[in-house]
Amino acid sequence: MNSLENLILVGVIKSCHGIKGHVMLKSFTDPATKILERNLVNESGANIHIKLISQNAKGELICTFNDIATRNEAENLKGYKIFCLRASLPELEEDEFYIADLTHLPVLNQDHKEIGKIKNILNFGAGDIIEIEFSNQTTELLPFNKEFFPIITKDYVILNYQREA
């Protein structure tokens, strides 16, 4: 059994597709089909078997999933999270990070004072967006680039941004 610390979320089942038990898989890998090259597991560490049927224009994968054969079975999988073992992932370059490693990191200002935490990392197609939950419980979305985040470490990020009062 694997703890969630040893797992990296690489995809989620969005919906069923058709009547043969196919599922629509949203992959968080780049490219989307890279997910198929990994040994996939669920939260408990049990192996998952996925076979690609096709890919739509949005990059979502239409797949068979384990032994699911009917639409009714596939409908029950909506929101099902798919992981791979952290140890199976390739080494990253110096300025590269996995989303799972950035989420919940402390956000520091230029004076190295903690002002919040990374709540989420989003991507709507035009680049990564960081959602920050500030100490006063407000949230803001900021582009994930060197201008806003000049320093990123495994322990914290520095934010170069003056918030409006």
From Swiss-Prot:
Domains as described in the record: The PRC barrel domain binds ribosomal protein uS19.
Subcellular location: Cytoplasm
Species per Swiss-Prot/TrEMBL record: Rickettsia conorii (strain ATCC VR-613 / Malish 7)
Keyword tags: Chaperone, Cytoplasm, Ribosome biogenesis, rRNA processing
Assembly and interaction partners: Binds ribosomal protein uS19.
Pfam families the UniProt entry points to: PRC, RimM
GO cellular component, one term: cytoplasm
Function (record text): An accessory protein needed during the final step in the assembly of 30S ribosomal subunit, possibly for assembly of the head region. Essential for efficient processing of 16S rRNA. May be needed both before and after RbfA during the maturation of 16S rRNA. It has affinity for free ribosomal 30S subunits but not for 70S ribosomes.
PANTHER family per UniProt: RIBOSOME MATURATION FACTOR RIMM
Chief location bin: cytoplasm
Domain PRC barrel, first and last residues per copy: 94-165
UniProt-recorded name of the protein: Ribosome maturation factor RimM
Family affiliation: Belongs to the RimM family.
